Amino acid sequence: MLESHLIIYFLLAVIQFLLGTFTNGIIVVVNGIDLIKHRKMAPLDLLLSCLAVSRIFLQLFIFYINVVVIFLIEFITCSASCAFLVFVNELELWLATWLGVFYCAKVASVLHPLFIWLKMRISKSVPWMILGSLLYVSMICIFHIKYTGFMVPYFLRNLFFQNATIQTEVKQAIQIFSFVAELLVPLLIFLVAVLLLIFSLGRHTRQMRNTVAGSRVPGRGAHISALLSILSFLILYISHYLIKTFLSSLKFHVKRFVFLFCILVIGTYPSGHSLILILGNPKLKQNTKKFLCHSKCCQ
């Protein structure tokens, strides 16, 4: 019989899974309907749709991990499933990184020639960003299968089977390359883009406040809302990275509080940020309301 804290944890995991699947599914469906109506899709909608699809698969895998942890069913550690895990996880991280770059290029006010060039071409570059991410992540998966195929199954066996043993002396160069290629590069790109956007929005908000002191400035609330949305994106993104690094560097018993908390935090990012995207994007929010109202009327 399950302990009380495991029952509570599993209920939270189910709620998290349903919320994440629903919010990301809404993004895909709403943008899909918009594509059918107008026979074209805006670059931001395309990026959001691809990100939502990758997050749905990521939520499915996280929920599968939760089921394995709670009910101790057999975990599949074949090379194909591990390669799929790496593919979905890395693709989601890169698409989220490009989303931060897109917001930065569109919203931030920077007079540097390189930034102006990026601002003018970012919309046309979105399909190439997605294609480049797919190719890059595919190369990472091939690298894992060829050189480090045993590392992911070993990490998973360490979590789920305490008696598992394997030679732990892995080439340091391979480990460093994996860390840089999979975690450090997208993280640095994201940090530069989002911090630049936060500073730009903060500076613009202060200028608006100082220009008309004591009066209500139109658009000021929108800037504050955008700033809070980007800050929440940054917090969720960084916490996601920190927890993953923490999990990969230490050994845990799967039913201990620290491990369960880490898995819950990892699942919060793809579900929580997608909800923030819907609430913070006026077009997406309006189309979601129309879709939900239409669904209720059809019942």
Swiss-Prot record:
UniProt keywords (A-Z) are:
G-protein coupled receptor, Glycoprotein, Membrane, Receptor, Sensory transduction, Taste, Transducer, Transmembrane, Transmembrane helix
Q: Which Pfam families match?
A: TAS2R (PF05296)
What GO MF annotations does this protein's record show? bitter taste receptor activity; G protein-coupled receptor activity
Among its keywords, does the record have Nucleotide-binding?
no
Q: Where are the transmembrane segments?
A: 10-30, 56-76, 82-102, 125-145, 179-199, 223-243, 258-278
Gene3D superfamilies named in the record = Rhodopsin 7-helix transmembrane proteins (1.20.1070.10)
Topologically, how does it sit relative to the membrane?
Multi-pass membrane protein
Q: What is its main location?
A: membrane
Compartment(s): Membrane
Positions of glycan attachment? 163
Is Ribonucleoprotein there in the keyword field? no
Give the Extracellular membrane side ranges.
1-9, 77-81, 146-178, 244-257
Q: Which InterPro entries does the record associate with it?
A: TAS2R
Top-level taxonomic group: Eukaryota
Q: Name one GO cellular component term.
A: plasma membrane
Q: Which ranges sit in the Cytoplasmic compartment?
A: 31-55, 103-124, 200-222, 279-299
PANTHER family membership: TASTE RECEPTOR TYPE 2, TASTE RECEPTOR TYPE 2 MEMBER 1
As for family, the record states: Belongs to the G-protein coupled receptor T2R family.
Q: Describe its function.
A: Receptor that may play a role in the perception of bitterness and is gustducin-linked. May play a role in sensing the chemical composition of the gastrointestinal content. The activity of this receptor may stimulate alpha gustducin, mediate PLC-beta-2 activation and lead to the gating of TRPM5.
Give the note: Most taste cells may be activated by a limited number of bitter compounds; individual taste cells can discriminate among bitter stimuli.
Name by which UniProt lists this protein = Taste receptor type 2 member 1
